[in-house]
From Swiss-Prot:
Disulfide bonds join 162-205, 196-238, 296-346. It comes from Arabidopsis thaliana (Mouse-ear cress). Pfam families: Inhibitor_I29 (PF08246), Peptidase_C1 (PF00112). The lineage of its organism: Eukaryota, Viridiplantae, Streptophyta, Embryophyta, Tracheophyta. This is Thiol protease aleurain-like. It comes from the Eukaryota. It catalyses: Hydrolysis of proteins, acting as an aminopeptidase (notably, cleaving Arg-|-Xaa bonds) as well as an endopeptidase.
Length: 358
């Protein structure tokens, strides 16, 4: 048994699944099924551990695609149980005919509590911070906008197992502002914000706000480049060096709490805007469409995840915000998602701000 457990769980499960079902379109050319001559023995092991169920094939593909490896029989059983619950959630949600679809992703073997601990980190009351200072002009706001088409939106990043979403929202806004101002791209240090911005009421891997990060950068004199101060995804001591500054902040502009008209004006005419919203349990499996929810809140105390609004539009008669996430390019729609516009859905316009670079 110990020899078998040292094998990747994905190999064990895919071997079993390939033999167990022909009607699901399993790729017969997959070389993984040739790993061992002891196919029947491996099948017996998997069945002994997990039992025969309709979820085994899906779990096998999941473990293989995301390189999941489990350290013991007990852990495999636990993760399979969690996976089944999440798969049932995805399937039941997709049957409701909603404006969005869910799909299995790298989070499918995590409980909701684990996911919250690893990925969310903007759960603070921002009402005292965000007194609106954005000025609406008479300029015509475009019907649709996608700042990616202007080439100023930096690539999607991955925050890892650290509640540092607020740092990625911050750097995303600054990278876009820098590119817009100076005509070239830049990658900025999230890790400096994790390590150094605590005096401005931020808490590293345990949360923070872009508006407070902008203030830190302004008074600190700048933010280092990613190359000079690379991301580790862990809290650490501050290693800021003024000689490695990539950008400086002259000021930051806040959107009035809940004012989607102001937010649309800013996103449409100025540049991408840092926003925060409440992630509810089904959102982590978002794949495409316009996300909407009747369970999320929209108060300053509800928001728990900071992201970057890079545009807006309409899909199947549903207006939406186009938003860049920090969960990697494989998540969602190539790292992006759409959130319903016009209802301050999940608080998307509750904590919004953007920087002015020097």
């Amino acid at each position: 048994m110990s020899v078998k457990l040292n094998l990747s769980s994905s190999i064990l499960l895919i071997l079993f699944a390939a033999a167990a079902s022909k009607e699901i379109g399993f790729d017969e050319s997959n070389p993984i099924k040739m790993v061992s001559d002891n196919l029947h023995e491996l099948e017996d092991t998997v069945v002994q551990i997990l039992g025969q169920s309709r979820h085994v094939l899906s779990f096998s593909r999941f473990t293989h695609r995301y390189g999941k490896k489990y350290q013991s029989v007990e852990e495999m059983k636990l993760r399979f149980s969690v996976f089944k619950e999440n798969l049932d959630l995805i399937r039941s949600t997709n049957k409701k005919g909603l404006s969005y679809k869910l799909s299995l992703n790298q989070f499918a073997d995590l409980t909701w509590q684990e996911f919250q601990r690893y990925k969310l980190g903007a759960a603070q009351n921002c009402s005292a911070t965000l007194k609106g200072s954005h000025k609406i002009t008479e300029a015509t706001v475009p019907d649709t906008k996608d700042w990616r088409e202007d080439g100023i939106v930096s690539p999607v990043k991955e925050q890892g197992h650290c509640g540092s979403c607020w740092t990625f929202s911050t750097t995303g806004a600054l990278e876009a502002a820098y590119h817009q101002a100076f005509g070239k791209g830049i990658s900025l240090s999230e890790q400096q914000l994790v390590d150094c911005a605590g005096t401005f009421n931020n808490f590293g891997c345990h949360g923070g706000l872009p508006s407070q990060a902008f203030e830190y950068i302004k008074y600190n004199g700048g933010l280092d480049t990613e190359e000079a101060y690379p991301y580790t995804g862990k809290d650490g001591g501050c290693k800021f060096s003024a000689k490695n500054i990539g950008v400086q902040v002259r000021d930051s502009v806040n959107i009035t709490l809940g004012a989607e008209d102001e937010l649309k004006h800013a996103v449409g005419l100025v540049r991408p805007v840092s926003v925060a919203f409440e992630v509810v349990h089904e959102f982590r499996f978002y794949k495409k469409g316009v996300f909407t929810s009747n369970t999320c809140g929209n108060t300053p105390m509800d928001v728990n995840h900071a992201v970057l609004a890079v545009g807006y539009g309409v899909e199947d008669d549903v207006p939406y915000w186009l938003i860049k996430n920090s969960w990697g390019g494989e998540w969602g729609d190539n790292g992006y998602f759409k959130m319903e516009m016009g209802k301050n859905m999940c608080g998307v316009a509750t904590c919004s701000s953007y920087p002015v670079v020097a």
